[in-house]
């Protein structure tokens, strides 16, 4: 369980950014400790019957296969060749690919557990995440999420547009290798973006 908590929750959700903005919002604006949120997410992933539970099963079964059935360590990425990613990277890739389903679950469980609406925060989290699938270059938000998240500014009501710069990849495997395999570049998971306040 502690292995999955680190490799299946903390690394994909925080380090690879899937719920980093959401967790930071809950912490800074509502006093929910990061470790408490991720422990809750772990319990939900383990015992629910949604997509996050399916990924929990895939991740832990892959680990068992590696340890006890002498199979190659890690997993391949859907649509790829025989290149195996560590399970935390493979889980992150699955979460990225199914990001809308992931956020549906996250929004729902956060509302039930904390009575906090994180729909717009999740929308911002997705917007700045370096996803392989195409998405709009600019989105409008009601708060200054970009400067709040990246520059520790006070979160205020402020209609603004966040314009992202898409990264180009040869294919899904090239994307996965850049984000989930090569090195440990800080905030590699987030796109370069600018915040434009409405006049």
Model-derived regions, located:
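Radical SAM enzyme core and accessory elements
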Residues: 1-199
